């Protein structure tokens, strides 16, 4: 995976260098937005089975996070460009549980677990621009900076447990994904985009569990 990361950086440098020796001029931009992330694979299927057994007492939801960073847009033709970038991205997964047994529901017993992982994402996109409308796809290489697991439990409105654990060592530090999406760019350089990341690398550091990152990103950016 480290080799793939170096390849991604080499592509970024090569595309910008290529533009400098042709008549095209690269533009640079910044982009930020929201991420809705989750997991897929055997681990997700096992969790779904647990949810069915719990009959609604446990619910899951995608983790909502934030991403921000910069990119270079390097024209190849009038309609096609390469866009390498580097972004800070928050990903993860949320799990909520409640005890609603008849006669003791007034106790308000509940538990929550939230996994928040912070990554550095390096996408290298091939982008097609048609009168402002954009279609793009390409590989993305990511490095896990930190994974934090927060668990809480409560009863009668009181917090009985509030634990934060550094879970970084439990996860693969390197991740690879395929990303693609659509967007629109205004004449002023302001652009909007929606994309989907499909993880290809196992999240488990020991590679025992088949769990992979998935994420939907909605972003707003501007090019200079």
Model-derived segments and spans:
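Membrane-embedded beta-strand positions in outer-membrane beta-barrel channels/transporters
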Residues: 29, 67-69, 81, 121-123, ...
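Residue-level signature of outer-membrane beta-barrel architecture
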Residues: 72-74, 126-128, 143, 184-186, ...
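Short glycine/proline- and aromatic-enriched beta-strand/turn motifs that initiate or cap beta-hairpins
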Residues: 20-72, 133, 223
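Outer-membrane beta-barrel channels and translocator barrels
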Residues: 21-23, 77, 89, 130-133, ...
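Outer-membrane beta-barrel "beta-signal"
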Residues: 27-29, 184, 212-224
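Transmembrane beta-strands of outer-membrane beta-barrel pores
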Residues: 34-38, 88-92, 130-132, 141-145, ...
């Amino acid at each position: 995976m480290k080799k793939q990361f170096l390849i991604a950086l080499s592509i970024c440098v090569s595309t910008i260098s290529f533009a400098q020796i042709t008549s095209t001029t690269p533009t640079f931009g910044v982009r930020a937005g929201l991420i809705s992330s989750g997991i897929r694979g055997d681990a997700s299927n096992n969790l779904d089975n647990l949810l069915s057994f719990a009959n609604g007492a446990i619910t899951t939801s995608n983790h909502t996070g934030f991403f921000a960073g910069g990119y270079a847009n390097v024209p190849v033709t009038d309609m096609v460009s390469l866009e390498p970038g580097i972004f800070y991205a928050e990903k993860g997964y949320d799990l909520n549980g409640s005890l609603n047994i008849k006669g003791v529901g007034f106790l308000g017993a509940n538990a929550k677990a939230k996994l928040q992982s912070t990554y550095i994402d390096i996408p290298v996109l091939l982008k097609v621009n048609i009168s402002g409308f954009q279609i793009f796809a390409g590989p993305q290489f990511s490095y896990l900076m930190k994974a934090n697991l927060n668990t809480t439990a409560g009863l009668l409105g009181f917090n009985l447990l509030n634990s934060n654990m550094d879970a970084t060592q439990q996860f693969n530090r390197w991740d690879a994904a395929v990303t693609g999406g659509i967007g629109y760019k205004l004449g002023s350089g302001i652009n909007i985009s929606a994309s989907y990341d499909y993880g290809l690398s196992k999240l488990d550091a020991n590679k025992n569990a088949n769990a992979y990152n998935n994420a939907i990103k909605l972003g707003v950016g501007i090019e200079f």
